[in-house]
């Protein structure tokens, strides 16, 4: 803790507030527009990847059934 005499309270408060203002740049909120665009693009890419991965399995399940001649040959 910092001990400040009653005569120097105003001086201390001014110096401390100036210090905080000088270092406030690192605390400013950042622009979130770019972040939402990136997350939407990432979500779309992930959805496309899931759809692409599911497509081959869907094609395999909808294949035409084997004919009796093809089954007998196996």
From Swiss-Prot:
InterPro entries in alphabetical order: Signal_recog_particle_SRP14, Signal_recog_particle_SRP9/14
GO molecular function list: 7S RNA binding; endoplasmic reticulum signal peptide binding
Any one annotated GO CC term: signal recognition particle, endoplasmic reticulum targeting
Entry's localization field: Cytoplasm
Primary location group: cytoplasm
GO biological process, one term: SRP-dependent cotranslational protein targeting to membrane
UniProt entry keywords in alphabetical sequence: Cytoplasm, Ribonucleoprotein, RNA-binding, Signal recognition particle
SUPFAM superfamilies: Signal recognition particle alu RNA binding heterodimer, SRP9/14 (SSF54762)
Job of this protein: Component of the signal recognition particle (SRP) complex, a ribonucleoprotein complex that mediates the cotranslational targeting of secretory and membrane proteins to the endoplasmic reticulum (ER). SRP9 together with SRP14 and the Alu portion of the SRP RNA, constitutes the elongation arrest domain of SRP. The complex of SRP9 and SRP14 is required for SRP RNA binding.
Quaternary state and interactors: Heterodimer with SRP9; binds RNA as heterodimer. Component of a signal recognition particle (SRP) complex that consists of a 7SL RNA molecule of 300 nucleotides and six protein subunits: SRP72, SRP68, SRP54, SRP19, SRP14 and SRP9.
Recorded family membership: Belongs to the SRP14 family.
UniProt protein name: Signal recognition particle 14 kDa protein
Naturally occurring in which organism (per UniProt): Macaca radiata (Bonnet macaque)
């Amino acid at each position: 803790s910092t001990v400040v005499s009653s005569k120097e309270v105003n001086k201390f408060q001014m110096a401390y507030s100036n210090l905080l203002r000088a270092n406030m740049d690192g605390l400013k909120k950042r622009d979130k527009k770019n972040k939402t665009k990136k997350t939407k693009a990432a979500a779309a890419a992930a959805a496309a990847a899931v759809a692409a991965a599911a497509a081959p399995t869907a094609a395999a399940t909808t294949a035409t059934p084997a004919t009796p001649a093809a089954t007998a040959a196996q």
